[in-house]
A protein has these predicted regions:
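Structured, hydrophobic secondary-structure cores that serve as assembly/anchoring elements
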Residues: 1-55, 70, 74, 328-430
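Extended basic-aromatic, gly/pro-enriched interface segments that bind polyanionic ligands
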Residues: 2-11, 172, 195, 249-381
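Assembly/oligomerization scaffold segments
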Residues: 34-100, 134-137
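Extended, beta-strand-rich, solvent-exposed assembly scaffolds of outer structural proteins
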Residues: 45-51, 95-169, 221
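Serine-centered coil/turn micro-motif
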Residues: 56-58, 162, 245, 374
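Extracellular Cys-Trp
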Residues: 65-83, 161-294
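Generic recognition of long tandem-repeat/solenoid scaffolds
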Residues: 89-91, 152-158, 332-335
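Extracytoplasmic/secreted envelope proteins and their assembly/folding machinery
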Residues: 122-125, 129, 187-190, 213, ...
Length: 430
């Protein structure tokens, strides 16, 4: 029986059943495991992950980013997805320039081509396809030219479901990247995983196209989870919020309160996993998610390969998306908001407080022969709830200026008394 059957708690946000350890635990939805019959495994270090995954797999790379932070998280869950995606990248020319160098990085190797003195879109695409074709094949992908002249584009498609590689242009002002991977059934896999193991809090995915991200975000929104995702589509940064149709804008438009997206052009960085690894060890609500340095993550700056202009930065801010950049000589995370605009530490603190109140009220009910429907009985519940509020003040999530409204037994409707339901108890925290 869930605790919500005993204590149904609703905490609303007035601005803009996990264990304590579970609130500090992330889950990576993976596909590279072999020989598993279970839907998840829990790890306490990268050594354990290395026993199950090759160092070339995205699961290992994401886990390594997660466990490399200080303070280090205590544990990580990797969930087994059975509905594997086919990874697809689409690369288009954003600016056709004569005698211009165009560069992409595939599986860690940079490939450069230079247009001639009478450059065309199609010429640049042909040069890029020829440059990366062999390396793409080695990585398990096919580099092909799509579209119709004079507006062709380059696609890189996994030769088998579950194939993964890193790929990005060094300058989104010249080349625009988009992941177009179809959603293979992310919600179905996650539903199966939580049946076996629901004691985790922060979801991470490895194939982050718009379709996959929106599916994962919708799933997390309906659960007591948060979803952190690194978005790499160039238009998240390069297109203004007012006219954008990219992933970050779609998440913002959907007003997701449980999804935090951060932009970095290189999907091999795993900035989402690194950020979760850095901040999940803190008591929920006691931390801020901006201004933090991440171990092993390359920051964006004014020049390639991880270029960030002030205009692009403002575009991301307008979409409530995060980013990782160099500021005053220090590499730090920026913004720390969920897609709907609330601070992610507020969401996390609220979730923990809700869970603790449910536990506290349930314990009063379960440890008492009977909680009488009198003012004295209501007082027992009030004392338990106030204890949770005081803990949240000590954690730094709430201020001590909160107010509590405690209903009297006489104010309750007879039908609620008969059903043993208490209505009207509430608290407000500035």
């Amino acid at each position: 029986m869930p605790l919500s059957d005993i204590a149904n708690v609703s905490i609303s946000l007035q601005t803009g059943g996990l264990t304590q350890q579970g609130f500090g635990t992330g889950l990576i939805l993976g596909y590279s495991m072999t020989g598993w019959t279970e839907r998840s495994r829990t790890y306490s270090s990268i050594t354990g992950v290395a026993a199950d995954f090759a160092t070339t797999t995205p699961e290992y790379k994401a886990a390594n980013a997660y466990f490399s932070q200080t303070p280090r998280p205590e544990q990580l869950v990797i969930g087994r997805g059975t509905l594997k995606p086919t990874m697809i990248f689409k690369l288009t020319v954003a600016s056709v320039n004569n005698s211009q160098k165009y560069s992409v990085v595939l599986a860690g190797t940079q490939f450069d081509v230079t247009s001639d003195g009478t450059a065309t879109n199609d010429e640049i695409i042909v040069l890029l396809q020829a440059a990366v074709a062999a390396a793409a094949t080695t990585a398990g992908f096919t580099a092909a030219i799509g579209g119709v002249a004079p507006n062709t584009f380059l696609t890189l498609t996994g030769n088998a479901v579950g194939n993964w590689m890193s790929f990005y242009p060094t300058d989104p002002a010249l080349l625009t990247l988009q992941q177009t991977t179809a959603n293979p059934g992310i919600a179905t896999d996650l539903d199966a995983i939580v049946v076996e193991n629901n004691d985790w809090y922060a979801l991470m995915t490895l194939y982050n196209s718009s379709a996959c991200v929106l599916a994962a975000a919708a799933w997390a929104e309906s659960k007591d989870k948060i979803y952190g995702v690194q978005v790499i589509d160039s238009e998240c940064a390069t297109v203004a919020a007012g006219i954008a149709t990219d992933i970050s804008k779609a998440l913002q438009t959907a007003a997701y309160f449980r999804t935090w997206d951060t932009y970095h052009p290189d999907n091999g960085q795993f900035i989402d996993a690194a950020t979760f690894g850095r901040l999940l060890p803190y008591i929920p609500g006691s931390e801020t998610w901006r201004g933090k340095t991440l171990a092993g993550i390359s920051a964006m700056g004014t020049v390639p390969p991880f270029k960030m202009t002030e205009t692009w930065r403002q575009n991301l801010i307008a979409k409530n998306a995060g980013y990782y950049y160099t500021n005053a000589g220090r590499n730090i995370t920026a913004e720390g908001k969920v897609a709907a605009g609330e601070w992610i530490d507020t969401i996390r603190g609220r979730d923990r407080l809700k869970a603790r109140i449910q536990e506290a009220v349930a314990l009063v009910v379960m440890n008492s022969d009977k909680v009488p429907y009198t003012d004295a009985g209501i007082g027992k519940l009030d004392n338990a709830i106030r204890g949770c509020l005081r803990l949240s003040v000590g954690d730094g999530f709430l201020t001590d200026a909160y107010t509590v409204v405690v209903p009297t037994a006489a104010s309750q409707a007879l039908v609620d008394k008969a059903a043993r339901i208490l209505r009207g108890y509430s608290f407000t925290a500035p």
